[in-house]
Regions:
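Anaerobic metallocofactor- and corrinoid-dependent redox/one-carbon enzyme cores
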Residues: 63, 68, 80-172
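Conserved mixed alpha/beta catalytic, RNA-binding, or beta-rich assembly cores of soluble enzyme
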Residues: 1-9, 18-99
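A general structural motif
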Residues: 11-13, 59, 120-122
């Protein structure tokens, strides 16, 4: 693994997080064959990517896999705010996808996009938990109030704010 070389560690000291999907079976086998550990998640790919920015706390060194473009852009925006790195490529594996890409003005169908290609300028990301996840608690309904947990990231300031909200019921 290139990451192990860059960090100056044995591949056995690297942990890759991968979304547990049939399309990733060959990728999981390849990472394991290289000697790295694999942790599989059933959902939460954006949170998984965010975890790579603090490997000392999360034990996750990199996130690998394919997914939808909107999630990729959201993850890139969060990584811009917290100082991570990310690369992505469009998967244009059908004639229809290639046609749609051409209609949107994409000329280089094999281009590798970096973090600033995916999320440029002063980026602000706000995410509120709906259901419990690894990154945020879900909405809690109490008799007189509703509790929420939100993360707000800003690239220009380099800040991450965790907001625990209390919303009184019955107000319009």
């Amino acid at each position: 693994l290139a990451l192990a070389r860059a960090k100056g560690v044995d591949p056995k000291q690297i942990t890759a997080l991968i979304l547990d999907r049939p399309r990733h079976a060959a990728l999981v086998a390849e990472v394991r064959a290289a000697g790295a550990a694999v942790r599989l998640i059933s959902d939460g790919d954006i949170a998984g990517i965010i975890f790579t920015a603090s490997p000392e706390e999360t034990g996750i060194d990199l996130y690998l896999g394919t997914g939808a473009a909107p999630e990729g852009v959201l993850a890139a925006a969060a990584m811009r705010c917290i100082g991570g790195q990310m690369q992505g490529r469009l998967i244009l594996d059908t004639p229809d996808r290639r046609r749609r890409a051409a209609e949107m003005g994409i000329e280089n169908l094999d281009r590798k996009y970096d973090l600033t290609d995916l999320a440029s300028g002063d980026v602000i990301v706000a995410a509120t938990g709906i259901t419990d996840g690894a990154l945020l608690r879900g909405v809690r309904f109490r008799p007189d109030r509703i509790q929420t947990e939100t993360l707000v990231y800003r690239s220009e300031a380099g800040t991450v704010r965790r907001i625990l909200g209390e919303h009184r019921r019955g107000l319009t």
